């Protein structure tokens, strides 16, 4: 899954049908180049500043490569992880109401009626330091 997600994220900027492993090490050892790390940092907004973080990423890619090697031909996709049980859906009762203001009060940070989530492990600037978003 990781390798597929990384490959999909890298496919367009790197020029088409090149796979992720071709941009790492040609032998597929899981080693990652500095250019790929910089690209992933921009895409995921995650800082890979330490060797430990890069090693963790390499382990995740190696695990994804092992998963890719699993032969799934002829295996039907599962609808549920609990195949021996029936999953009952609750009745969905729609309740109309304009409660956006109440919902936004539950958030620690709000910008122009949107929730603000911290991007990965890079801390957000303080609200006073942020520039307002341009209106389109």
Curated annotation (Swiss-Prot):
It catalyses: L-glutamyl-tRNA(Gln) + L-glutamine + ATP + H2O = L-glutaminyl-tRNA(Gln) + L-glutamate + ADP + phosphate + H(+). It comes from the Eukaryota. InterPro entries: Asp/Glu-ADT_sf_sub_c, GatC. GO terms for cellular component: glutamyl-tRNA(Gln) amidotransferase complex; mitochondrion. It is an enzyme of class 6 (ligase). Keywords: ATP-binding, Disease variant, Ligase, Mitochondrion, Nucleotide-binding, Primary mitochondrial disease, Protein biosynthesis. GO terms for biological process: glutaminyl-tRNAGln biosynthesis via transamidation; mitochondrial translation; regulation of translational fidelity. GO terms for molecular function: ATP binding; glutaminyl-tRNA synthase (glutamine-hydrolyzing) activity. It holds the Pfam family GatC. Its EC number is 6.3.5.-. It is found in: Mitochondrion. This protein may be expected to contain an N-terminal transit peptide but none has been predicted. NCBIfam families: gatC (TIGR00135). HAMAP family: GatC (MF_00122). Subunit of the heterotrimeric GatCAB amidotransferase (AdT) complex, composed of A (QRSL1), B (GATB) and C (GATC) subunits. It is linked to Combined oxidative phosphorylation deficiency 42: An autosomal recessive mitochondrial disorder characterized by onset in the first months of life, cardiomyopathy, respiratory insufficiency, lactic acidosis, anemia, and variable impairment of mitochondrial respiratory complexes I, III, and IV. Death occurs in infancy. Belongs to the GatC family. Allows the formation of correctly charged Gln-tRNA(Gln) through the transamidation of misacylated Glu-tRNA(Gln) in the mitochondria. The reaction takes place in the presence of glutamine and ATP through an activated gamma-phospho-Glu-tRNA(Gln). This is Glutamyl-tRNA(Gln) amidotransferase subunit C, mitochondrial. The gene is GATC.
